[in-house]
């Protein structure tokens, strides 16, 4: 059916989507991605194409590509593909200078949050956030990112906290 529709109109989105799904079922994910890619690159794809494309990319382990594609997509596509988006973690309290010890909390729609407190860029080998962090006297440079259940990373946040206990 897809081939007949494509013979008449090679740019038919529904027919290309059907062809890609057929290729995926037969185990040819690479070809399925190649069929859908022009729609994504030309920004002409509807939400169905985006959903199938990011699903295939995720299955192929290309999660960074998923993140970049959805970051630049319009709101309708982002909403349709929300399960593939990992929002950046939120820190509380806000960065700044404080005169008392602070309890830092990180939250997000992530399965895990990785962080560093020395200003270095976190990796998946960094500490995993499991409980609030006590910020004591001195300067703390937090960097953190989240990973969702689809293994897609968020952007890295960077926050600076200065604790001065004996402030005049």
Label each PLM-derived region with a short phrase.
Residues 17-18, 22-37, 41-43, 47-168:
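Short, compositionally stereotyped local motifs that mark structural "simplifiers"
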Residues 2-7, 13-25:
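Alpha-helical adaptor scaffolds
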Residues 9-10, 43:
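Residues at alpha-helix boundaries and short interhelical turns
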